[in-house]
Amino acid sequence: MIDAGGKEYLYQNFDGQPSMCGTPMIFETKSKNKIIYGHHVGYGVENVVFTKLSELTDKKLFYEYQTFYLCMQDKVEEYRVFLITVKNKELDWNYQQKDFTSADKFYEWIADAKKVALIYDTDLKPKFNDDFVTIQTCLDAYSSKRVILLAVKIREYTMENDSF
């Protein structure tokens, strides 16, 4: 679902029908940093949208489930998570930064991200020209804290050549 300004994604499925699981919502698919919001349900429903993401704060699970795929209309993008943090009101880092005016601004943003990271994969070296995905969900169904994952695109598959 692409953002249309409302919060319908919290309570509807892809078909617009009521759903306690909601639907992931993408902010601006053409920016350098796609921001995806999803519901943490926590109502005893397993594997629903982003409910399990908070478990990636465990280092073993972080490295085990570090790769994910984003399926778009005409392509599939492969991403690797390199950072996870939990945001509360005191977090001084603009994880919602969509584009960067210069390489210096980008590397400053990455340095700020490292400062607040619970886990940061030092094997990945994000570059100014890379594309990213930021995923945000609630820490749990009752908290105002947010789990933030930052991932870099490592590969893209087109639907035409079926290489995926």
Residue ranges and their predicted role:
Residues 1-164:
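Solvent-exposed, non-transmembrane regions of membrane-associated and secreted proteins
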